[in-house]
Amino acid sequence: MGILRVYHPDIEEFVTVKNDPRELNNFNLSVAVTDAFIAACREDGPFSLVNPRNGREARKIRALSLLDLIARSAWGSGEPGLVFLDTINRSNPTPHAGAIEATNPCGEQPLLPYESCCLGSINLVKVLRGEAIDWEKLERLVHLAVRFLDTS
């Protein structure tokens, strides 16, 4: 998943890149939305885009115009999604390890910088005995699956 913060100077190009179906067609995109951006949208106010290299304001835009651009692009191409990183970080279970900066491609696993996400699944049909669940088999399978994920 490619995530760009809402205040990045290239945000408008990032938001609209998938309007061309030939661009990044096997890659998910999301915008990291901040509380400050949402507040600027509520007030229909300006919002600063900030150069990540020097921390200086590159320019101001109308927050609602950017939100409209995001919505139109999402309606047309299915992307970008929105990731509310400030909200996620308020619930960060390991803030001492760092701030969450991204998620896995589907967004269900918040990630610290440089973390990866290995997902697993279990075919529950394989633990059926007739129409009942074989709970002992499921327990063994879950333990094995967790072991595989822990060592991946």
Segments (PLM) and residue ranges:
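Active-site cavity-forming subdomains of large catalytic enzyme subunits
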Residues: M1-L138, S152
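Active-site helix-to-loop segments that bind/position phosphate- or nucleotide-bearing substrates
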Residues: R140-R147
